[in-house]
């Protein structure tokens, strides 16, 4: 005799999961917009140099992590809304949620760490080479880098919380023997 199917999560838990997915996607959308529009023009000894986010490898990695995370968040939003509407969960969703949440959360964490590290190092380097103050465009460039890294960190935290829920859901799911 087959074991009974797992009981679906309560409406309150599903609502919390949906809100966390929306929050993750919102953080990632803002991160993508903020980092992809990050540019500065430097005037150094009558030479104009335009610096973009894609001139810094760590910012490119941060943007890539945010875009991949955003794609995953959108897919998960659709799956969560579907589960919310139907009240049922496909058996493969447990594993997809478990592994996806773990992998993408680590990707977001490393992207955030890269953004914080390069913002700190490059800002100190620029300050050592050229006299800048807090109103300078270079400072704003790196402040946007810090803001993007912070939002990516917030997205990681909300996805890490979702990862705990997906771990619990997978562990409570009965093992199916073929």
UniProtKB/Swiss-Prot annotation:
Keywords: Cell membrane, Membrane, Transmembrane, Transmembrane helix. Its main location: membrane. The keyword Thylakoid does not apply. It comes from the Eukaryota. Homodimer and heterodimers. Pfam families: CASP_dom. Residues 36-60, 171-178 are extracellular. The lineage of its organism: Eukaryota, Viridiplantae, Streptophyta, Embryophyta, Tracheophyta. InterPro entries: CASP_dom (IPR006702). This is CASP-like protein 4D1. Residues 1-14, 82-149 are cytoplasmic. It comes from Arabidopsis lyrata subsp. lyrata (Lyre-leaved rock-cress). It is found in: Cell membrane. Belongs to the Casparian strip membrane proteins (CASP) family. The chain crosses the membrane at residues 15-35, 61-81, 150-170. The keyword Cell membrane applies. It is a multi-pass membrane protein. GO terms for cellular component: plasma membrane.
């Amino acid at each position: 005799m087959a074991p009974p199917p797992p009981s679906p999560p309560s409406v309150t838990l599903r609502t919390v999961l949906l809100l966390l997915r929306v929050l993750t996607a919102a953080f990632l959308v803002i991160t993508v917009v903020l980092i992809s529009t990050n540019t500065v023009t430097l005037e150094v000894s009558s030479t104009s140099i335009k610096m973009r986010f894609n001139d810094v490898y760590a910012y490119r990695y941060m943007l890539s992590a945010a875009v991949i995370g955003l794609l995953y968040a959108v897919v998960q939003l659709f799956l969560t809304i579907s589960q919310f509407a139907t009240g049922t969960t496909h058996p493969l969703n447990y594993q997809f949620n478990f592994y996806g949440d773990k992998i993408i959360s680590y990707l977001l964490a490393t992207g955030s760490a890269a953004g914080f590290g390069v913002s700190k190092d490059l800002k100190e380097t620029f300050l050592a080479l050229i006299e800048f103050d807090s109103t300078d465009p270079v400072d704003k460039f790196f402040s946007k880098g810090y803001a993007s890294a912070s939002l990516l960190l917030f997205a990681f935290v909300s996805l890490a919380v979702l990862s705990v829920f997906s771990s619990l859901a997978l562990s409570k799911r009965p093992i199916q023997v073929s």
